[in-house]
Amino acid sequence: MEINGIAHTFVTVGDFDLSRAFYSKLLPFLGMKNVMDIPGTYYCVGGRTGFAIREAPEENRGDGFDQNRIGLHHICFRARTREDVDEAHAFVKDLGAEIVHGPEEAMWAPGYYSILFEDPDGIRLEINFVPGKGLLK
């Protein structure tokens, strides 16, 4: 069997209204279309995947995100060009995201180029570009 990508990712957020305001701008910028917007859930699809935020139960909202705990470390969205990464950097800065690093190359694959930033809960999000098939060639 060979998988055909990641079908969807759900992220649990502490302040749903704040996170919805953030993701309802970010995800459409990334070409994703909203398909569900109900109390406690905001879900978009596009680029052969889905991405959703869900409200944390009240008793868990104070815990906060820590990428070094067991579980999620970060999420990376794949861009089609280096210029897309540069454009995304300007967009997320204007959105008020905490920038971890601006556009830069990294050793993960030949031509790997990315930005890294945080959502309102401190969940790290990356947007990268890798030319050609990258490590899959």
Q: What are the functions of these language-model segments?
A:
Residues M1-R20, I75, P131-K137:
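N-terminal beta-strand motif that seeds the catalytic metal site of vicinal oxygen chelate
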Residues A7, L26, L30, T49, ...:
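Long, contiguous binding/interaction regions
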Residues F10-P57:
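Core segments of cupin and vicinal oxygen chelate
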Residues V13-L18, C76-D121:
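Vicinal oxygen chelate
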Residues I38-G40, H73, Y113:
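Residue-level marker for the onset of beta-strands and adjacent loop->beta junctions
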Residues Y43-V45, G64-F65, L116:
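Short glycine-biased active-site loop of nucleotidyltransferases that positions the nucleotide triphosphate
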